Amino acid sequence: MAEIKKGSLVRVVREKLENSLEAKASDNRFPAYIFESQGEIVDTRGDYAFIKFGKVPTPNIWLRLDQLEKFE
């Protein structure tokens, strides 16, 4: 797998996000755009990345790096 780092374009892997601790801790009805469109990693801290989805005004989100994959 290619390295995911600051500036990488990514998408969220649905199977890895659903039923995760993050999904259980908040509303688990995630918007489709996080799975279908590209987001840019703005920052990383430990095992987490801060992701910005830029086509429409949406809130940025912290997710685990293992829940992301390079956007192709």
UniProtKB/Swiss-Prot annotation:
Mode of membrane association: Peripheral membrane protein
Pfam families, per database record: NdhO
Classification via InterPro entries: NdhO
Superkingdom: Bacteria
GO molecular function: oxidoreductase activity, acting on NAD(P)H, quinone or similar compound as acceptor; quinone binding
Assigned keywords, A-Z: Membrane, NAD, NADP, Plastoquinone, Quinone, Thylakoid, Translocase, Transport
Catalytic class of the enzyme: translocase
Reactions catalysed according to its record: a plastoquinone + NADH + (n+1) H(+)(in) = a plastoquinol + NAD(+) + n H(+)(out); a plastoquinone + NADPH + (n+1) H(+)(in) = a plastoquinol + NADP(+) + n H(+)(out)
Compartments reported by the entry: Cellular thylakoid membrane
EC identifiers of the protein: 7.1.1.-
GO cellular component: plasma membrane-derived thylakoid membrane
HAMAP family associated with the record: NDH1_NDH1O
Job description of the protein: NDH-1 shuttles electrons from an unknown electron donor, via FMN and iron-sulfur (Fe-S) centers, to quinones in the respiratory and/or the photosynthetic chain. The immediate electron acceptor for the enzyme in this species is believed to be plastoquinone. Couples the redox reaction to proton translocation, and thus conserves the redox energy in a proton gradient. Cyanobacterial NDH-1 also plays a role in inorganic carbon-concentration.
Identification of the protein by name: NAD(P)H-quinone oxidoreductase subunit O
